[in-house]
């Protein structure tokens, strides 16, 4: 049987191996972007982009946050870009309504501030008129200890036109009453 100390030692050794391969160095590049990125409310010519940037120290405002939307993952062909800011009263969340996009097209997006980049997200505008095929992913009720989060990974790897998240789980169990004891 493996004990807690062995697991923690294994994690420490694994983290050292990751930094050799550059994975942790990449993560350090997005310092401050603690909640990833998201997109939503797509129309045929626009989409909302979201992220959260947490500046260090006792800062009230984060300015000069660059947002970029590109046709390619490498951001060699920029479709739209701009600058925005956020502040403590918004919990440092960033929300941008990107307009002037082409319909039915996949885009890649990110946020940049002081040399730190967010993760790269992927979004798609809605098509205009009738389409031969429209692939929809649907998710709901995400109870972390009950798992099955690999389904989100499968959706991310699929060529979906839209992902609709219907809501989240209502955690109605009393303490000590979870279906899975790992939840405690």
Can you name each region flagged by the protein language model?
Residues 12-16, 24, 79, 84:
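Residue-level detector of intrinsically disordered, flexible termini
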Residues 1-15:
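N-terminal secretory signal peptides and thylakoid transit peptides that target proteins
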Residues 9-13, 21, 35, 75-76:
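Generic signature of intrinsically disordered, low-complexity, basic-rich segments
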Residues 18-31:
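Bacterial Sec-dependent signal peptides at the C-terminal "C-region" and cleavage site
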Residues 28-184:
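Divalent metal-dependent phosphoesterase catalytic cores across multiple superfamilies
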């Amino acid at each position: 049987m493996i004990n807690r100390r062995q697991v923690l030692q294994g994690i420490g050794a694994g983290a050292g191996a990751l930094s050799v391969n550059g994975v942790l160095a990449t993560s350090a590049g997005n310092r401050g972007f603690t909640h990833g990125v998201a997109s939503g409310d797509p129309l045929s010519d626009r989409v909302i982009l979201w992220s959260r940037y947490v500046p260090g120290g006792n800062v009230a405002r984060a300015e000069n946050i660059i947002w970029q939307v590109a046709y390619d993952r490498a951001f060699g062909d920029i479709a739209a870009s701009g600058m925005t800011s956020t502040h403590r009263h918004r919990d440092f969340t960033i929300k941008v309504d990107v307009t002037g996009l082409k319909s039915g097209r996949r885009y890649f997006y990110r946020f940049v501030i002081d040399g730190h980049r967010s993760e790269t997200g992927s979004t798609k505008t809605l098509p205009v008129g009738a389409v031969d095929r429209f692939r929809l992913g649907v998710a709901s009720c995400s109870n972390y200890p009950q798992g099955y989060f690999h389904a989100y990974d499968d959706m991310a790897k699929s060529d979906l036109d839209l992902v609709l998240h219907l809501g989240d789980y209502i955690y109605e169990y009393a303490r000590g009453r979870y279906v899975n004891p790992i939840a405690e």
